[in-house]
């Protein structure tokens, strides 16, 4: 389980490098690059080609890859992990539902919070919730306490739901609306690859170690 969560732990590093808006990107580029990267606005923004040259795009894409890897690895294996640790099938199955309920809550409240305290803060908070949730889930195995499972899975799902929404908001903020459909399409391909690898790699790790806590 620890190895499966490594990509999630890497995600906060990315946020330190994400600029708040296109003007911040331009401030650090030379004059030639400035001519190519124009400030994003509601009426315009970056083209897909310009976006693919932006470090912000790749930071967001790697973050999306990591979070989808982690959430789908958790969804795919939480039942097996809890069942293998001696929890009843009812508790193990309920764990999956809690993740989705938390995800719904995160998606609903993250947009409002982003308007109140800023998108980047909410984004970092979402990752922190996922990390804290994963620690509580691991602790529940050692202490055999179902309450830790419920809290941990709720935090995990809520954090992911918030991240899912904030990625889309940040794309609009950073790159504008002129090519937002194409940009989100590329990011969705990347996060889908991460989501597809999550359950598979976690299964390979478990098969080789016979332990989710490695």
Task: Give the residues covered by each predicted segment.
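Symmetry-related core transmembrane helices of the 12-TM Major Facilitator Superfamily/SLC fold
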Residues: 2-16, 214
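Flexible cytoplasmic inter-helical loops of multi-pass small-molecule transporters
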Residues: 20-45
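Extracytoplasmic gate region of multi-pass secondary transporters
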Residues: 49-112, 198, 202
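Cytoplasmic membrane-interface "Motif A"-like loop-to-helix N-cap segments
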Residues: 116-127
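C-terminal ends and interior cores of transmembrane alpha-helices
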Residues: 128-142
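Paired small-residue
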Residues: 144-155
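Intracellular juxtamembrane helix-capping segments at the cytosolic ends
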Residues: 162-175
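A late C-terminal transmembrane helix in Major Facilitator Superfamily
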Residues: 174-209
